């Protein structure tokens, strides 16, 4: 285990979150064999050394992705993941899906973008007071439409292009999201339990994807990575702007000195 990996997450934190508990042995996917430590009382126990390694690699990838100016789409529609995914994605300034994954979200993004723009337009109209010009029934109908659209698209209504990566809780449940990401060439980072197929995932974080504490721990680390990536990007942009300013000042100084000589 590297020093950096130890700093990112401790074995104790993983154990306390229950990240090591897999599914019943009879429900396993044999492809997960390399990530399984042992079996106890009919339950597979995940090798947490592999969890730390996977999380560390995923963390670095997310940092680099966001630093390059791309966004991450967090996906977790199972009940125990919804609140955490929305909170952590929002904290990191990223996008999220916590309701049903709609087919075509990635593979038919042109249509998806139109629906997102429609939602934004409706909200803009309401903010400008245009609903006040309508009948009460018409205004209520549009309010209901906004509420309905926000429930489905609220976590990604400012997403104007495809994300640079997906972070998924339970790729077995989110099979359609994984399929669309694979088809569009978008890398997938995922919490992968013992019943999942790791071959479909670019960055496998083997762990319990059902326990709330495990989901909170891993999702928070991915959000931290996105924040670090954004900070790195802003720092780089500041350096570039600073260098440009210095070059401009130097040029002006040289010009003034040249004028003085003349």
Curated annotation (Swiss-Prot):
GO MF annotation: an example = structural constituent of ribosome
Recorded GO cellular component terms are:
cytosolic small ribosomal subunit
PROSITE patterns named in the record: RIBOSOMAL_S2_1, RIBOSOMAL_S2_2
Q: Which PANTHER family match?
A: 30S RIBOSOMAL PROTEIN S2 PROKARYOTIC AND ORGANELLAR, SMALL RIBOSOMAL SUBUNIT PROTEIN US2M
CDD domains according to UniProt: RPS2
Provide the protein name.
Answer: Small ribosomal subunit protein uS2
Q: Name one Pfam family in it.
A: Ribosomal_S2
Query: Does this UniProt record's set of keywords contain Transmembrane helix?
Result: no
What is one GO biological process annotated to this record?
translation
Which keywords describe this protein according to UniProt? Ribonucleoprotein, Ribosomal protein
For this chain, the family text in UniProt reads: Belongs to the universal ribosomal protein uS2 family.
In its UniProt entry, the species of origin is given as Roseiflexus sp. (strain RS-1)
